[in-house]
Amino acid sequence: MYAIIQAGGAGTRLKTISGDLPKVMVEICGKPILEWQIESLKKSGIHDFLVIISKNGKPISDYCGDGKKFGVNISYIVEESPLGTAGGLYFAQDIIKDDFVLCFGDLMLDVDWTRFHHFHKEKGAALTAFAHPNSHPFDSDLLVANEEEKIIKIDSKNNVRDYYYQNLTNAGLYICSKEVLDFVASPTKIDFEKVVLKHFIEEGKAYAYRSSEYVKDCGTPDRFYSVENDLKNGIIHGKSLANPQKCIFLDRDGTINKYNGLVTKPDELELMDDTSSAIKKINASKYLAICITNQPVIARGDVTLEELKNIHNKMETLLGKEGAYLDGLYFCPHHPDKGFEGEVPEFKIECDCRKPRIGLLKKAEARYNIDLNKSWFIGDTDRDIQTGINAGCRTIFLDTTPNPPIRFKDAKPDFVCHSLSEAVNLILNSERDNHD
C-alpha cells in the first residue's frame, strides 16, 4: 500500500520555530515531522511513499532523497502552483492502483495502520477518515456518523449548535480507495474535505474510524511545544494501538452523572461536580477513559436508541465544554425479565453484555487493544465491582449513591473512594509511585 503525504505547506504559523523551512521539516526531538510520519507508516509495512511538495520543497527532497536511508521508497509530486489539499492527487492516478493512505504534513502521530486498513476493508469504504474525540469540540468541525460508523454529514464549527452533539472530530488522516483518485478529474485547486470527502459522504461511501491513538496538528508554536512534550513523555508512541493499552472503565449513572433513577431524557442527565476535571486527568495520562453502562430503558420501552444517543450526546457536549472527553462509550440495551407493558421484545433477552457480564469490556478490549489486567473499573454499585473482577481489572467503589442495592455481596473492591476525582488521583498517583 502507498502513502501520500501532503507536504506542500509553507508553515507560516510556525515561522518563529521553523524559519524558512517547510513545516514538515521542523524538527521535534531531533527528527523532522515527516520522518516521524514515515517511521510510523513503515512499522505497519508501508514502504512506498508519494510526497507532494511545492516548488519550494527542495529542502524536503534533499533531506529524504529516494527514501533508501529510511528503508522505504519515496517519489515526489511537485506542484508548480498551489493545488489545495486534493488537486495534487490527480498526478498519482497512474502510479497508485489500490488503497492508499493520505496524510497531511503537519500531523504528529503514531497509528496502527494495519488495524486502520482492516476497518476500511471490512466496511467496504471508498474513503475512511481517522476520527477521534478532542478537548475542544465546541470550536471544531465534527463528523456525524451512524451506528454502522458511516459518515452522514459534517457538522461545521460555524453552525449555531443549539443541540447536543457527539464529540467526533476529523483528524486529517485517511485511507482511500482508487475511486478517490479517479474522482480528482483535473489538476486544479481542490479542497479535500469540502469537495472530495463531501462527495463520498453523499454517495454513502465514507466511514469514520474512531480511535484513541495520537494524531495531533502541530502547526502552531503552542501545539508544537505540547506535542514535543508528549513525545518526550512517551505518550505518542504509547497510544498506538499496536501496543497494549491501559484503561479506566467508568460506570455512567452515579459515577459520571448524578444518580437520578432511570434517565429517560437529556434534561435528567447532570454531571457530577468533579466529573470533567477527573476525566481530563485521565485524558492527559496514559490511560483510556471508556464508559460501560447498562441501559435497560431501551428494553423497557422508555426510550428509543435514537433518544439514548441524544442523552449520551448531552454527556459528551457537557464534557467537551470543560475540555474532557471519553475515548469510547458502550451500553447494554437488554434486560432478561419479560412480560411488562410497553417492553421491546427484541431487547428482552439474556445477553453477554449486561453487567456484570463482560461482553462490553471484551468489545472495547478488541477495538482498543486493551490489557484488562492493567486496567481499572470504577463504579457506584457492587454490580460494577463484580464486572471489574470478572474482567480481571482492579476496582474502585464510589460511595456516591445513597443505599445502593446489594446484589453481589461477595464483590469486594480493591479501594473505596468518595468521588471520581479521588479515585482517578489514586490510580494516577499509584502509577507514578510504581515508576519512581
Which residues are covered by each model-predicted region?
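Conserved N-terminal catalytic core of the sugar/cofactor nucleotidyltransferase
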Residues: 2-5, 27, 31-105, 113-115
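Active-site neighborhood of HAD-like aspartate-dependent phosphohydrolases
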Residues: 245-289
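N-terminal nucleotide-binding beta1-loop-alpha1 segment
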Residues: 1-19, 243-253
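Substrate-recognition element of Asp-dependent hydrolases with the DxDx(T/V) motif
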Residues: 52, 275, 279-315, 325-339, ...
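Catalytic-core segments of class I nucleotidyltransferases/pyrophosphorylases
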Residues: 100-101, 108, 114-121, 134-137, ...
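A short, conserved acidic/glycine-rich loop-to-beta-strand motif
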Residues: 123-133
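Conserved Lys-Pro-Asp/Glu-containing loop-to-beta segment of HAD-superfamily phosphomonoesterases
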Residues: 101, 344-346, 352-385
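Acidic, Mg2+-coordinating phosphoryl-transfer loop and its flanking beta/alpha structural elements
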Residues: 376-415
